[in-house]
Amino acid sequence: MGKILLSILLIGITIAPALLMGADKFVNIYSARKEALILPLLKRFKKETGISYRLVTGKADGLLKRLEIEGSLSPADLFITVDAGRLQRAKQAGVLQPIDNPTLEQRIPTSLRDRENYWFGMSQRARTIIYNTKTVDATNLSTYEELASPKWKGKLCIRSSGSVYNQSLVASMIEVNGIEKTESWARGLVRNFARPPTGGDTDLLKATAAGQCDIALANTYYLGRMINSKISSERKAAQNLAVFWPNQGEGDRGVHVNVSGAGVTKYARNKKEALSLLEFLVRDKSQKWYAEVNNEYPVVEGASISKTLESFGTFKADSINLT
């Protein structure tokens, strides 16, 4: 009990109302996704399956720490978070278990799930080049590697090296190009900064639209949010921006993609229900919901995408395994 109380004190959490409701079948979820991006699907899941949910939301690192502290006393059955890097940390921390599930293995490509099935991607996002259409000719863009070229000196906006999104991109670069070349590339990016790394992806895109920089590395769904924003200034800023898909040449690896995903916890008491929820989240209807609501790409091939995503065009994605 002391461990559980300590873990609650360590992090700020939100518990959905369903936590207070008794049910014969239920699944306990620790989610680093915002409640608005998971709760509507949980309500559909309960309506269709009769399985209730107990949802705890919070910061990814805090929830992971909580799982570690709680150990075998943890009530969590499922851990949901964004970025493969965080999912790998959960695996390495020993709080997840491997899963043998034909439905998940069939619907989710091997590149978008853990090699040993400790976690599975639920939706994917592309971290790509977004540029100011008034200051950049797209024919001058080509690859991630080329962003380190001196011609982009003083023109690049990027998040800090502490961003897990950038860490995952760098890890993919190391896998392809090796450590030495990737270190040299990173130094080139630093030389090309238009300003010190500050803020999140939305801040980068606003700065690019305003002409403070010409190009940014960002996840596409942030641009999707701006395009569909209720704030007129954000919609106006988005009109100055466009997506460029790098590394599309013949034989090249394609665009770096990452996932939001989930894994069944090591001590899950409701494993069957947790697996039912995972299967529900990769159904076509659920995949379409993520695409329409948050402009994330489906992990299931052939699932529908939003009109906003369609406007970005098609691209070849990097097939490197995210683990």
Language-model features: locations:
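Short beta-strand->loop
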Residues: 30-33, 96-105, 115-116, 119-120, 131-133, 139, 145, 232-256, ...
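A structural signal for short loop-to-beta-strand junctions that line the ligand-binding cleft
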Residues: 74-79, 97-129, 145, 156-158
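Ligand-binding pocket segment of bilobal, Venus flytrap-like solute-binding proteins
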Residues: 168, 172, 176-246
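Mature extracytoplasmic/periplasmic domains
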Residues: 260-319
